[in-house]
């Protein structure tokens, strides 16, 4: 089994495997190009994002600056918005559903390092996937976390445990505050009138 395959399976792997640095530098060059573009060049910025990300649906937009380790491990549905200064450490897979709104300074960290110093000093790490459902608006997410659909994550929250569908969650660590109810939906309808 190759080190890249171990990485994709969430197994301890050697981060110095051949090709990894080249993949990282290719992505960082694209991020640099994106970050230097005029903010008004929306079409050009979207084109660079589509070069970076493995798969993305319609209507992807990111504000500057972004940092993405590899890009080929990130997939998103339609209507992805990434606000300023977001970080995606993606040796593991990051998947976003449709209608995902990422607040400023959010981080998605699939890399996880061993507690044991001997292993860590050998440049070994794990990569655990992050999965985000549809209709989600939130802050930072830790490795191995799944966030359900129709979720609101409060500002400044650090998500270290899975969050189910149809809830408001917040805090550090992030926890479910309450379900999203029919009253919330009715309030939304009233605002639209």
Stretches with model-predicted labels:
Residues 66-76, 81-146, 172-173, 177-190:
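Flexible, glycine/small-residue-enriched loop-and-beta-strand segment within the central core
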Residues 1-59, 174-193:
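Terminal amphipathic alpha-helical/low-complexity segments used for targeting or macromolecular assembly
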Residues 152, 168-170:
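Short-chain dehydrogenase/reductase
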């Amino acid at each position: 089994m190759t080190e890249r395959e171990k990485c994709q399976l969430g197994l301890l792997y050697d981060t110095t495997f051949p090709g990894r640095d080249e993949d990282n530098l290719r992505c960082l060059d694209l991020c640099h190009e994106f970050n230097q573009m005029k903010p008004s060049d929306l079409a050009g910025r979207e084109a660079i994002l589509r070069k970076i990300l493995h798969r993305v649906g319609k209507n992807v937009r990111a504000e500057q600056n972004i940092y993405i380790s590899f890009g080929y491990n990130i997939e998103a549905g339609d209507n992805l918005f990434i606000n300023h200064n977001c970080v995606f450490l993606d040796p593991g897979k990051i998947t976003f559903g449709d209608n995902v709104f990422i607040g400023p300074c959010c981080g998605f960290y699939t890399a996880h390092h061993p507690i044991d110093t001997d292993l860590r000093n050998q440049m070994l790490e794990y990569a655990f996937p992050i999965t985000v459902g549809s209709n989600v608006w939130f802050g930072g997410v830790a490795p191995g976390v799944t966030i359900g659909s129709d979720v609101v994550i409060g500002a400044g929250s650090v998500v270290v445990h899975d969050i189910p569908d149809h809830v408001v969650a917040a805090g550090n660590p992030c926890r479910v505050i309450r379900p999203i109810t029919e009253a919330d939906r009715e309030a939304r309808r009233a605002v639209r009138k």
